[in-house]
């Protein structure tokens, strides 16, 4: 009997994968609540780390928020896909090493001075990029081969000035077919309340 995975690709996942095929170094992913952008990006990164040599930094404005969100989701997906044991997890450093593929992933908060400077990475993923400064973005992304950033469309910020037709996608909850009926109803109710 085969296992039914809880974490499966959504329309968001496929749209992001197609976007990443473009000839760009920077990819900007906007999406509201329930769009599935973070889970989709983490699934793509986990697949990369499990099949390819590479070094990845996943970061956000605050390390405590990152631990409660993206790090926790990363672990849940790896466990669900039965690949968690492929990684050596250093929980005090928030790092994952796949010794078979010689791949490495670290989770860092950008709330410590100079923490993002000097890292050479294959991929840098900035979760909730609208909560970091342009200088923090420049520091963490300067030596990266590929940069992915996501954000909720709350207000205009520095990333909007970096958007091109080849590096941007806008997702919404309709791109996440695994969203619960209750969450869909909640999101659609926001419209009637004029949020």
Regions found by a protein language model. Name each.
Residues 1-195:
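Phosphate/NTP-binding elements of NTP-utilizing enzymes
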């Amino acid at each position: 009997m085969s296992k039914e995975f809880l974490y499966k690709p959504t329309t968001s996942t496929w749209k992001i994968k197609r976007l990443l095929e473009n000839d760009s170094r920077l990819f900007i992913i906007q999406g509201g609540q329930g769009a599935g952008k973070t889970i989709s990006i983490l699934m793509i990164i986990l697949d990369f780390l499990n099949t390819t040599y590479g070094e990845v930094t996943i970061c956000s404005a605050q390390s405590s928020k990152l631990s409660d969100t993206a790090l926790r989701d990363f672990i849940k997906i790896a466990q669900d896909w039965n690949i968690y044991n492929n990684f050596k997890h250093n929980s005090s450093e928030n790092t994952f090493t796949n010794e078979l593929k010689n791949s490495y992933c670290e989770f860092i908060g950008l709330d410590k001075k100079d923490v993002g400077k000097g890292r050479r990475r294959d991929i840098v993923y900035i979760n909730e990029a609208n909560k970091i400064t342009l200088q923090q973005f420049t520091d963490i992304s300067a030596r990266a081969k590929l940069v992915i950033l996501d954000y909720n469309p709350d207000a205009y910020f520095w990333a909007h000035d970096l958007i091109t037709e080849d590096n941007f996608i806008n997702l919404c909850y309709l791109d996440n077919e695994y969203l619960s009926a209750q969450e869909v109803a909640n999101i659609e109710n926001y419209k009637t309340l004029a949020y």
